[in-house]
């Protein structure tokens, strides 16, 4: 699976 959830994406 692709780790594109919100591990490094914090607005």
Swiss-Prot record:
Highest taxon of the lineage = Eukaryota
Q: Which is a Gene Ontology cellular component entry for this protein? A: extracellular region
Cite the entry's keywords alphabetically. Answer: Neuropeptide, Secreted
Chief location of this protein within or outside the cell: secreted
Compartments in which it is found: Secreted
Q: Name one GO biological process term.
A: neuropeptide signaling pathway
Q: Which family is this protein grouped under?
A: Belongs to the FARP (FMRF amide related peptide) family.
User: What does this protein's UniProt record list under function?
Assistant: FMRFamides and FMRFamide-like peptides are neuropeptides.
Q: What is this protein called?
A: Extended FMRFamide-10
Q: Which organism was this protein described from?
A: Austrophasma gansbaaiense
Highest classification ranks of the organism: Eukaryota, Metazoa, Ecdysozoa, Arthropoda, Hexapoda
């Amino acid at each position: 699976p692709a780790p594109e959830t919100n591990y490094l994406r914090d607005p």
